[in-house]
Amino acid sequence: MPAGVPMSTYLKMLAASLLAMCAGAEVVHRYYRPDLTIPEIPPKRGELKTELLGLKERKHKPQISQQEELK
């Protein structure tokens, strides 16, 4: 096994790591409960909290790298 660790110790660490990962995911999922409701009327533009503000209309031109200018 890696670094000379016995197989039993390796499997115990693997099991403990997986258990901790699953427990952490469960706690986070219970704390941040997803909103699974589906509205009958779709929300108007801008009402969704998940809408990215960076994708809206830009006020300035994006910078072009020097490599792209040379092409």
Curated annotation (Swiss-Prot):
Region of interest (Disordered), residue spans: 52-71
Tree of life domain: Eukaryota
Record topology, Mitochondrial intermembrane segments: 26-71
One term under GO cellular component: mitochondrial inner membrane
Location within or outside the cell: Mitochondrion inner membrane
Oligomeric form and interacting partners: Interacts with UQCRC1. Interacts with UQCRQ. Interacts with UQCC5. Forms a complex, named COMB/coordinator of mitochondrial CYTB biogenesis, composed of UQCC1, UQCC2, UQCC4, UQCC5 and UQCC6; stabilizes nascent cytochrome b/MT-CYB and promotes its membrane insertion. Forms a complex, named COMA, composed of UQCC1, UQCC2 and UQCC4; activates MT-CYB translation. Forms a complex, named COMC, composed of UQCC1, UQCC2; UQCC3 and UQCC4; mediates MT-CYB hemylation and association with the first nuclear-encoded complex III subunit UQCRQ. Interacts with MT-CYB.
Name of the protein in its database record: Ubiquinol-cytochrome c reductase complex assembly factor 6
